[in-house]
C-alpha cells in the first residue's frame, strides 16, 4: 500500500474499505477509552473518529471494546507439537495476531533447513510471525545436536529474510558471554550491527555477571523467577518478558514487580505451551485475564501484551489502534471478563464466535525429513553396577524448570542400582538420536511414576531421545516403539503400549490438524494415570536435558552441573 492511497481515506475524500462503528477503543497511548469509529483501508488503519460514517463494509461493534492484536514476545512453536499453520489456527481465536518465534528446537535437529521450513511455512497466513534466529545451536558443548548453526549461516539467513528475522534468539549460553566465547560474540556483533535485538536467557544472573551479560547488548530476559530478580534486571535496562508457560509459570511471582511507573518495560510471553494448555487457559489473552484478576490495571495489562512488546522489537506499526498502524484488532466484551467476540486481521474478520472463518494455509507444504530419523546406538544396556557410593539425583519441581541436586543412598538389587519407587526416584536415560554417538543414564526424583515408562524425542534443546521408567524392560520397549514412530511420545506399562503421539516433523511436531493432536495428547496425559502419575509431567521430562537452566540436568553425554557447566559422575566421591 502506498501513502498516497491511504491519505485521501483519512481525509474523508475516499471511502474506507471497512468502517467499524460504535467502538469503545482502548487507547494504549493515553490509557483512556474512547467511544469512536475506526476506518480501515487495505491492511491499515486509515483514521479514528466520529467523522467517519461510511465504508464499503460496515461493522457495528455495538459497544464492544477494541484492543490491539495481542503479541507473544517469545515463543517456541515447536513446543506446541503443532506445525506452524496449525499453531496459527489454535491461537488466533484467542486474539494473538503477532508472535516472535525462536525456532531453536527444530534448528537443533535440522539446522538451516529447519529454520527455513518455519519461515516459509508461515508466509501468507493471517498471523504476523517474526523470528529470533537461534543463537546457540547446539546450546552447549555438553550435548550432541543434529546440526550446528555458525555465524556464516546467520549472515545468510538474515540477508535472505531481513524483514522476518528481527532478533538474535535467547542467548542461553551466558557462561559463553562471560568467557567472551569468540563464536558467540561474533554472532551477537553480526546481529546488533544489523540493528536486530539481542534476546536474553539468564536465570538467576545477578551483580557483576549480570552487568557483563548486558554489556554484550543483551536487552531482554524471560527467565526471571522472583520479583527481586526482575527488578534488578529492569533497573539495568532489560525488558522483562513475564513467562507463563505450561511447565514454567512466573506470572504470580513477577506481577508484584510491576507498577504504574515501570510497566512499559514488561511484556508477556508463553515460551513453551502445549495445545491442551492453550485450549484450557488461552494464550496471551489468558495471561492478561490472570493479571487483571490479580489486581493489575486492565490498561497496563493490555499494554504489556501489545505496545510494550512492539516498541521493544521496533515493530513500529503494531501494538496500538492508531492511524497508519496495522489493522489487527481484537474485540472483547469488557475489561474484566475479557471474552473475545471477534478478531480482525489485516482489515478482515478472521475469528468470529471463537471460530476461524478463513483459510489458514501457508504457501508451502513441504515438510523436511528428520535427519537420520531415530538413530541411536545399537548395543546398549540400561544396567548400572553399584559402586558402593551415594548417587546424584535430579529433583524436579512443579511450576519451574529449575531442578535441584539430591545426594542419596542408591537402591541396590543384585549388585545393580535400580529405581526406588518408594522414594520416587526412577531411572532416566538420554540417547543421542542424531549421530548414534552414545547415551547416558541417571536418576530423577519427583515424576511420581509407579510402574512403567515414558519415552520422547522432545528434549530441550538438542532433542535427543529421553526415556524414564521404573524398570529396564518397559524402558527398552518404549525405546523400540519410539523408533517405530520415527519420533514422538510413548507411554508403556508391562511391555504394552498404552498411548502414543507421532511427531514426524523433526521428531518435534505433528503433521496432523490441531484437533487431532489435542485429542491424542489428552489420551496420552490420561494414560499417565495408569502408571501412577496424577499430574502432567511431560513438559518437565522435556526439559530435563536443558543444560542452561540450573541446577542438575542430564544430556546424552552425562549428568550436567549447570552452574559449573561440566559433566559430573552419577556416583559421588566421599
Swiss-Prot record:
Q: Which family does it belong to?
A: Belongs to the metallo-dependent hydrolases superfamily. Adenine deaminase family.
What is this protein's record name?
Adenine deaminase
So where does this one cross the membrane?
A: none
Q: Which Gene3D superfamilies match?
A: Metal-dependent hydrolases, Urease, subunit C, domain 1
- Asked whether the keyword Ribosomal protein is assigned, the reply is no
Keyword field: Hydrolase, Manganese
State the EC number(s).
Answer: 3.5.4.2
Please name the top-level EC class of this enzyme.
hydrolase
Q: Which organism is it from?
A: Thermosipho africanus (strain TCF52B)
- HAMAP family tied to this protein: Adenine_deamin
Catalytic activity of the protein: adenine + H2O + H(+) = hypoxanthine + NH4(+)
